[in-house]
Each structure stands twice: as C-alpha cells, then as structure tokens.
C-alpha cells in the first residue's frame, strides 16, 4: 500500500517527461481505479486484507531494485490496466454509488475506463448509468434504446420515467426553439406513451391508479363517511395524500346524489384539487339534510315568479307590443311568467293573466332560509318594500293573516318580526311620485262650457333618438297630468304602456266586459304589480283578453301615415255606450279651438278638481260650436322633442286611419292650428252621429305636407286655416288642399 504514493514521487525525481504525458492521458483510468479500490475496501475486510497483503509482497520484492532502475516507473504504470480485473458486481456497485451521489461526470469517466465487454455485459445499474450519461450528452436516441432494451425493476420506474419524459421535452424544445407549456407537455405525453419496460401498465386517471381506486371503492361500499383515522390509513395504503382521499369521498357522494336525482353523471374520479373542508367532521345526518336545501336554492336563484291563483295559461303566439319605437314579438320561453302569455317589455318577457298577485323575487346572498315557527300558528313573510316617495327600501316581516304589501315584494331572509332595515337593493329604480287619480263613473262625460287650459312641459327621460326614417314612432309618457279618454265597447283588446307605479292610469268600472290592458314599462322590477280589478294597488286590471294586443304608435307605410291609437300613459280610460254601426264616420269642417302656446283645453269631469291639475290652470272660452258637442284635447307640448321629431314630408297622399290596425271609437282625432303637433280628441256627446275630425296646424316650411290624392291641385291660400283632410272610408279625399 505504501508503494502507490511512492511511485508518483519517484517519477518526477527521474525527470522523465514521458511519465507526465502518460499520467495525463490515463487520468480517467486512474480515477476509476481509485473508485474501485475504495469500493473493494468497503466490501469486506477479508478481501481487502488479502488484496493488501498481495500488494505489499509485490512492493517488497520490487522495492530494493526500484530506485536503481530508471525504467521501473513506466512498467509500474503499464501493469495496472492489464493486471486489474473487476467483477460485474463490483462495476454495478460503483455505478449504483455514483448514481445515488448524482455525479454524472465521474460516472461518465468511469464507464469510459471500462472494457467494451464490461459495458456491453452491464447489469441493471450499468444500463441505468449509461442512460443517465446518454441524457447528459443529449443522445436521446441512445437513451430510448437503452430504456426499451430490457424491463427494469419497479423500484426504479419513477426515476426512469422522469428521465424519459425530460428527454422528450428537451428534444421538442430543441426542435421548436422555444420552451414548452403545460399543454405542449401534455400532448407529448399523449403522443409518446411510456415504454412498457419502465411502466407497470396501470393507467393513472387524475392522479389515481387502478389499485388506489379499487381500495377507495371498497372502503366506500362499507362506509360512506370514514373517520379521519380511516382516511389516513387509506392514504398510506394507496399512496395518496389525505386531501386526495377526502376529495374522492366527497365527490363520490355528490355523484351518487346527482345520479339518484336524475341529473347528468359527473366525471369518473376527483381531480385531486386541495380543499380546506374536511367532511369527516360533519355527521351523515347533517350532510343529508343539507343536500335538499342546496338543490332547491340552486333552482330558485336567478328566477322571477309571479304568484297567481290558477295554473299558467298557454301563451299566445301572436302577442306583441310596441316598446321604444319598435315591435317586439314574444317568441320562445319567457324569462318571467305572469301566469299567461309572454309580452316583452325592455328585454323582459312578461305575460298576460286574469288574476295576478304581487311580484315575488327570491332573495340572494347565500343566507339560510327562514325557519318555520315552532307553534305553527302563523307564517311570517319577509319582503323588501320600496317607497316611491322617499326612495328607501324597507325589509319587513308580516304574518300571513295580515294583508299583502302593495307593490313589488322580494322574498328574502330578514330580521325579527316588525323590524325595519334600510338598505340598497340592486337594479331597483323607484318610479315617479304618486299623482292624484280621479276615476270617472261609467257613462258619457257631461259637456262643460269652459274647458281648462293646462300648460305642459316636456317629460324628462323621453327618448329622443328617433330618426326621420324610423318606421315606428312610440308616444308613451307624454302627458304627466290626468286625462279622460272615452272608448266604446266595440274596441278590441288594447294595451297601454304605463310610466311606473306612480302613474295615475286606471280603468273605470263598466257594466260590460273590459278590454283594456295596462302594462308597466318602468325600469325597476318593483313597479310590476298587476292585481285583479277588486284588489287594491297602484294599477287596476279588469278582465284581460288574451290574443294579439293593439299596439299604439305612428307608422309610415308606402308613403302613407297611419295614425294608430296613441294615448299618453297618464290617463283615465272609461267605456261608454257602443257607437253607431258602421266603421265609416262622416267628417265635417270645423273651426279649431285657439289655445296659447303649450296650452291645452281639457274637458274636466266633476271628479277632477282644479286643485290636482298640473301647472297653471286658466279658463278660456271656446269659440262658438254646436250645443250638443264639446271638444277635449289631448295635450302634446310643442317643445317636446319626442313628438314627431323631424318627420319627413311624405308624398302627397291621403292621410288615413286604418280600420284593420286600430280600434274605432266615438272620440275623434284632430290636430289644431293653435299649437304645433297638438292632437285633439273630440267626443260627440249629443244625439247626432259621432264623427271624427283630423286637423293639422300651421306648420313651418319643414313640416308635414299632406295633400289629396295624386293629380290634385294645391291651394296656397289655406295655410292659416285648418281643413278636413280625409274621411274614415276607403275613398280618397274629394277636396284637395295643402298647408
């Protein structure tokens, strides 16, 4: 053993440069021999002692002559490669030690020092060492060949699989010139599956192998709610974490509940996502009780239901309504069911119903549902009530015996009985303050000698985006004051757009069946309350009729202006005796009532006092007229931008009222010359046959030009005088004129 360090010192003393060159060329072999000597000393003391004695005897025989022989160092340097012979076990032990230490460079040099026969005859450690060296050198084809050459023990599968996948990733990155993402790596794993030599063939689905899944299923069949100790034992047995085991049981129970309820089955296994909830701390009874409320809340959230007395009626397919200047047809399943046919208002599908209760919305926020009273004497109802005057939202609870709160009610959990909580409510816009309403008795409106003049102002928020080419003009929310419109019983179903919960729109009681429908187009859902005619509320709905409603508005078709029944939303509707038979009503020229700018003559009723009129009221005597007639004008402010804004001049054709599209009633439509765009409705209240007069004001050069039929001559001298333009017949106007 002492000769090994003496030989290097003797070489330099001799001054031979050949020794230094030989030592440089055989550096790797010397390092490999030192590793082998260390390994031999560690294997056994007996074998190491025998080897040391043989080496000492050889050194003693060569020791006396070595200093005097100058050629002895080259011989000693050349003898170890030929004289040293290593067994396969020794080579495998060195390779295993270097593999565990992670010295890939030293392992590469050691394998290079081995004879070719030893490398080719290598055992499992030698093959794994060669695979690691091939991976470090970038020889991926050699790595794949080595891994597929023979099966490897299962203890080394994880290391070899990681080596194989890393080689695939590096090879793809070298080919693409960029780093791989998670999706790219997943595709590579699907494209290049693991070789069978380093894989047991057991497929892993969501981090769960077949054996682990079988053990979990066996435990689940015996106990669906294992204790924490049982979960830990399962995690140790299957090689999974405690979180994965808990998630698997939770997902399996949820799948069983979903499958029992007829829902779609979920995926096969859990995805292994971590969770902080441990269901083992909850009892089975608590979990079973919590399953049904969760499913019920999931079905109820996000839905709007309107309580009614009977089952929902079939929805008419032809229901439609004019909203914001366009027709909206109700097609498909409605989003809100009002126990009847769907009607779409501002993107919200509503419906018709004979008797409707208050609007009920489910409360959100994830709060638990209110528990029933243990006595069972009365059931508390929690509601959010919006006060239109103060704009506050009150949370109240009332007994079932108490009358229902008017307006929209939102069902939500709240505090104790009688407690009020003020808080904001999302997407709830309070309507205008409640105005005074004066319902009229059934029958004709008595004539009044002196009408009242009500100056008006344009209502805020009226849509002004109507283009001149718009085919439909909607005229809702024009007059905020109360008006009176008399309709005969022959009028078909009519739907009116209300402004909100504060609009005084009511339908007076009548002997015959009523056919006027009031539909609210307010922004907030709290303004939707359509109770029966006998129930108190903001609106009164009397015997609605199913079918296609008659839409209000103004349409331009084929050069003709068709004026439909356009009423302000703030009005009182009453029915009178049926009119004379026949749709054609005679026309007669009549002098228009002159009113100041912005004024309107209104025929008041005994139930309409002056104290509740809007604006400044002034009396004005009308011009001489027949004793049996009285004129009542529906006001339209001249400065209102929403009334026929910039309407183009159509070709000179007849201005007609379409009997097929609008109802016919005894009130006539007329345009007075006193104000711009003033629409007057004249009602015949005497013994003469009812008539309809249509008049136009004195327009500017950009205004409406409505003439007679084609070929008629225009009279230039009739600009300041209102004339009769057309009759309610299918014949053209006989007298040509122009404004």
UniProtKB/Swiss-Prot annotation:
<comment type="subunit">
    <text>Probably binds DNA dimer. Interacts with EYA3, and probably EYA1 and EYA2.</text>
</comment>
<dbReference type="GO" id="GO:0000978">
    <property type="term" value="F:RNA polymerase II cis-regulatory region sequence-specific DNA binding"/>
</dbReference>
<comment type="similarity">
    <text>Belongs to the SIX/Sine oculis homeobox family.</text>
</comment>
<dbReference type="Pfam" id="PF00046">
    <property type="entry name" value="Homeodomain"/>
</dbReference>
<feature type="compositionally biased region" description="Low complexity">
    <location>
        <begin position="617"/>
        <end position="646"/>
    </location>
</feature>
<keyword id="KW-0371">Homeobox</keyword>
<keyword id="KW-0217">Developmental protein</keyword>
<comment type="function">
    <text>Transcription factor that is thought to be involved in regulation of organogenesis. May be involved in determination and maintenance of retina formation. Binds a 5'-GGTGTCAG-3' motif present in the ARE regulatory element of ATP1A1. Binds a 5'-TCA[AG][AG]TTNC-3' motif present in the MEF3 element in the myogenin promoter, and in the IGFBP5 promoter. Thought to be regulated by association with Dach and Eya proteins, and seems to be coactivated by EYA1, EYA2 and EYA3.</text>
</comment>
<dbReference type="InterPro" id="IPR001356">
    <property type="entry name" value="HD"/>
</dbReference>
<dbReference type="GO" id="GO:0045892">
    <property type="term" value="P:negative regulation of DNA-templated transcription"/>
</dbReference>
<dbReference type="Pfam" id="PF16878">
    <property type="entry name" value="SIX1_SD"/>
</dbReference>
<keyword id="KW-0225">Disease variant</keyword>
<dbReference type="GO" id="GO:1902723">
    <property type="term" value="P:negative regulation of skeletal muscle satellite cell proliferation"/>
</dbReference>
<dbReference type="GO" id="GO:0005829">
    <property type="term" value="C:cytosol"/>
</dbReference>
<feature type="compositionally biased region" description="Low complexity">
    <location>
        <begin position="1"/>
        <end position="24"/>
    </location>
</feature>
<dbReference type="GO" id="GO:0001228">
    <property type="term" value="F:DNA-binding transcription activator activity, RNA polymerase II-specific"/>
</dbReference>
<keyword id="KW-0539">Nucleus</keyword>
<dbReference type="GO" id="GO:0000785">
    <property type="term" value="C:chromatin"/>
</dbReference>
<dbReference type="InterPro" id="IPR009057">
    <property type="entry name" value="Homeodomain-like_sf"/>
</dbReference>
<dbReference type="GO" id="GO:0002088">
    <property type="term" value="P:lens development in camera-type eye"/>
</dbReference>
<feature type="DNA-binding region" description="Homeobox">
    <location>
        <begin position="201"/>
        <end position="260"/>
    </location>
</feature>
<feature type="region of interest" description="Disordered">
    <location>
        <begin position="361"/>
        <end position="381"/>
    </location>
</feature>
<keyword id="KW-0010">Activator</keyword>
<keyword id="KW-0805">Transcription regulation</keyword>
<feature type="region of interest" description="Disordered">
    <location>
        <begin position="617"/>
        <end position="650"/>
    </location>
</feature>
<feature type="compositionally biased region" description="Basic and acidic residues">
    <location>
        <begin position="279"/>
        <end position="289"/>
    </location>
</feature>
<dbReference type="GO" id="GO:0160024">
    <property type="term" value="P:Leydig cell proliferation"/>
</dbReference>
<feature type="compositionally biased region" description="Low complexity">
    <location>
        <begin position="74"/>
        <end position="83"/>
    </location>
</feature>
<dbReference type="GO" id="GO:0005654">
    <property type="term" value="C:nucleoplasm"/>
</dbReference>
<keyword id="KW-0238">DNA-binding</keyword>
<protein>
    <recommendedName>
        <fullName>Homeobox protein SIX5</fullName>
    </recommendedName>
</protein>
<feature type="region of interest" description="Disordered">
    <location>
        <begin position="1"/>
        <end position="84"/>
    </location>
</feature>
<dbReference type="GO" id="GO:0005634">
    <property type="term" value="C:nucleus"/>
</dbReference>
<dbReference type="GO" id="GO:0000981">
    <property type="term" value="F:DNA-binding transcription factor activity, RNA polymerase II-specific"/>
</dbReference>
<feature type="region of interest" description="Disordered">
    <location>
        <begin position="251"/>
        <end position="294"/>
    </location>
</feature>
<keyword id="KW-0804">Transcription</keyword>
<dbReference type="GO" id="GO:0043231">
    <property type="term" value="C:intracellular membrane-bounded organelle"/>
</dbReference>
<keyword id="KW-0963">Cytoplasm</keyword>
<dbReference type="InterPro" id="IPR031701">
    <property type="entry name" value="SIX1_SD"/>
</dbReference>
<dbReference type="InterPro" id="IPR017970">
    <property type="entry name" value="Homeobox_CS"/>
</dbReference>
<keyword id="KW-0209">Deafness</keyword>
<dbReference type="GO" id="GO:0007286">
    <property type="term" value="P:spermatid development"/>
</dbReference>
């Amino acid at each position: 053993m002492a000769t090994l360090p003496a030989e290097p010192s003797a070489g330099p003393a001799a001054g031979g440069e050949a020794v230094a060159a030989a030592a440089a060329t055989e550096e790797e072999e010397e390092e490999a021999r030192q590793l082998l000597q260390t390994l031999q000393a560690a294997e056994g003391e007996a074998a190491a002692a025998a080897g040391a004695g043989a080496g000492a005897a050889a050194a003693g025989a060569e020791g006396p002559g070595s200093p005097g022989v100058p050629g002895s160092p080259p011989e000693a340097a050349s003898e170890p490669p030929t004289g040293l012979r290593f067994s396969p076990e020794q080579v495998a032990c060195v390779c295993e030690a270097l593999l565990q230490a992670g010295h890939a460079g030293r392992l590469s040099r050691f394998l290079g020092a081995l004879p070719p026969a030893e490398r080719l005859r290598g055992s499992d450690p030698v093959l794994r060492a060669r695979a690691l060296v091939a991976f470090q050198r970038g020889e991926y084809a050699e790595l794949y060949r080595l891994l597929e050459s023979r099966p490897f023990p299962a203890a080394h599968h994880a290391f070899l699989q990681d080596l194989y996948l890393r080689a695939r990733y590096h090879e793809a990155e070298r080919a693409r010139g960029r780093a791989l993402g998670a999706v790219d790596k997943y595709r590579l794993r699907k494209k290049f599956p693991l070789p069978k030599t380093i894989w047991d063939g057991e497929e892993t689905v969501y981090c769960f192998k077949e054996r682990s899944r079988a053990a979990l299923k066996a435990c689940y069949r015996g106990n669906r709610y294992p204790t924490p100790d049982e979960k830990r034992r399962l995690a140790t047995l299957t090689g999974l974490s405690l979180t994965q085991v808990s998630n698997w049981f939770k997902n399996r129970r949820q799948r069983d509940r979903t499958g029992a309820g007829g829902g779609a089955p979920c995926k096969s296994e859990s995805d292994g996502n971590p969770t902080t909830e441990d269901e083992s701390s909850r009892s089975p009874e608590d979990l079973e009780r919590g399953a049904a409320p969760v499913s019920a809340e999931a079905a109820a959230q996000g839905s709007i239901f309107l309580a009614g007395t009977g089952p929902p009626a079939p929805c008419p397919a032809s229901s439609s309504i004019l909203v914001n200047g366009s027709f909206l047809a109700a097609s498909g399943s409605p989003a809100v069911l009002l126990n009847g046919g769907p009607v779409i208002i501002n993107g919200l599908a509503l419906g018709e119903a004979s008797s409707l209760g208050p609007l009920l919305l489910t409360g959100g926020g994830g709060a638990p549902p209110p528990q029933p009273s243990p006595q069972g004497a009365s059931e508390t109802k929690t509601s959010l009530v919006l006060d239109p005057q103060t704009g506050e939202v009150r949370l109240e609870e009332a007994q079932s015996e108490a009358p229902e709160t008017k307006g929209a009610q939102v069902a939500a959990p709240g505090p104790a009985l009688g407690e009020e909580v003020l808080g904001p409510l999302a997407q709830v816009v309070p309507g205008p303050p409640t105005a005074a309403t004066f319902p009229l008795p059934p029958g004709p409106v008595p004539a009044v000698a002196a009408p009242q003049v009500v100056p008006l102002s344009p209502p805020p928020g009226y849509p002004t985006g109507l283009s001149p080419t718009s085919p439909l003009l909607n005229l809702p929310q024009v007059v905020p004051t109360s008006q009176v419109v008399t309709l005969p019983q022959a009028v078909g179903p009519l739907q009116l757009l209300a402004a909100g919960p504060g609009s005084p729109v009511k339908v007076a009681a009548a002997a015959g069946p009523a056919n006027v429908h009031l539909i609210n187009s307010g922004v907030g859902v709290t303004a939707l309350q359509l109770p029966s005619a006998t129930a108190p509320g903001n609106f009164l709905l009397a015997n609605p009729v199913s079918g296609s409603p008659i839409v209000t508005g103004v349409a331009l078709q084929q050069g003709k202006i068709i004026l439909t029944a356009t009423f302000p939303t703030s009005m009182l509707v009453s029915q009178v005796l049926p009119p004379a038979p026949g749709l054609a009503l005679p026309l007669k020229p009549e002098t228009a009532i002159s009113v100041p700018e912005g004024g309107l003559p209104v025929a008041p009723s005994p139930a309409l006092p002056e104290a509740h009129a809007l604006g400044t009221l002034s009396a004005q005597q009308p011009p001489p007229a027949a004793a049996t007639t009285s004129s009542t004008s529906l006001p339209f402010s001249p400065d209102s931008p929403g009334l026929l804004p910039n309407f183009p001049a159509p070709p000179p054709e007849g201005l007609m009222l379409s009997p097929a599209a609008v109802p016919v009633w005894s009130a006539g439509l007329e345009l007075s010359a006193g104000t711009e765009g003033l629409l007057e409705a004249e009602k015949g209240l005497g013994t003469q046959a009812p008539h309809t007069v249509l008049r136009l004001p004195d327009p500017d050069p950009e205004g409406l030009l409505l003439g007679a039929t084609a070929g008629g001559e225009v009279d230039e001298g009739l600009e300041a005088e209102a004339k009769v333009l057309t009759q309610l017949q299918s014949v053209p106007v006989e007298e040509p004129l122009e404004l």
